[in-house]
Regions:
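Class I Rossmann-like S-adenosyl-L-methionine
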Residues: 2-148
Length: 148
């Protein structure tokens, strides 16, 4: 297996190249800290962004994605529960957080559906692994067919 150590890029025989953009990965990392460890997003996000090397536009995207996902958490969890073929309380917390970010992109941001699904699945592949990314892909496709 050949590893390219750039953020989110993995090259391996038989697998396609996966690129996860830094803003989504930072939003995932902060959301995970908030949901699992009770971290304060308003303290952790600026800290992560200050050392990220992102430009102003990407910082703004990460900020809106994170804070918006937290604001819409109840609604988006409710919708995801309706479309999931698994009991939502049994779903891996990492998957739940990836879906929260993806659902916010679908329902509340100006991200085209296909791009939101693709970026969310790539994020899942990178941070959770291929097997969990399959579930994320299936659920994101169901959610992308839903309109609010």
């Amino acid at each position: 297996m050949v590893l390219n150590l750039k953020l989110g890029s993995v090259l391996s025989k038989g697998f396609r190249k996966v690129n996860v953009d830094k803003p989504r990965q930072i939003a995932f990392e902060v959301l995970t800290e908030v949901m699992q460890n009770g971290a304060y997003s308003n303290l952790l996000l600026p800290q992560k962004l200050s050392v990220s090397g992102l430009d102003t536009r990407d910082k703004a995207f990460a900020t809106e994605l994170l804070y918006g996902s937290i604001r819409a958490l109840g609604r988006n969890d409710f919708i995801a529960r309706q479309y999931s073929d698994r009991n939502w309380s049994d779903v891996d917390p990492g998957i739940v957080n990836v879906i929260r970010l993806g659902a916010y992109q679908l329902f509340d941001m100006r991200v085209p559906n296909h791009a939101a699904v693709d970026a969310t699945v790539n994020l899942a592949r990178t941070v959770l692994g291929e097997s969990k990314a399959s579930f994320v892909n299936a659920l994101m496709r169901k959610l992308s067919a839903k309109s609010l």
